[in-house]
Each structure stands twice: as C-alpha cells, then as structure tokens.
Amino acid sequence: MPTICFLNGIMIIMHLTNKEHNPPHIHAIYGEYEATFYIIDGELYEGGFPINEKKLVKKFVIKYSNELLEMWKTGNYYKLPPIN
C-alpha cells in the first residue's frame, strides 16, 4: 500500500489493487484508528476516526480529489503535500 501523505500524524494510503476495491477510496491510519474515506467527497466510508482528524482527512481528500482519483484509475501513486 503506497503512502500518499503523512498528515499531522495521520498516514494516508491507497491499495495497489484498486480495481477490486470499488468505490474509489483512501485508507487513513491514526494511532489505533483505521478508516476508509470516499475520494469523491471525503466522507467516512468504513471504520472509526476521531472527529478532528476525520475533518482534516475530509479536507485533504476534497483538496486533492482529482489527484487521488487519477492515482486510483492509473495506479501511478505519488506523495502529496500535507494541508494546513
């Protein structure tokens, strides 16, 4: 699973086998928490996450949704800068 970004202690990753894991999403890991977020709107898809970190991941996904969707479609993964 390529790491896309480290965001204030949150690791944002994407699975390599994206075609088997629709709808397009990213995984976020923060300490003991793991969750999946939709790329299209940044909403929590599965798992649990603290509220402030959930808001930060959503903001990140919305900002980079085009880049994340392109990675999902092509399998060409690269690191994205964190947001403030």
What are these regions (language model features)?
Residues M1-N84:
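Basic nucleic-acid-binding interfaces
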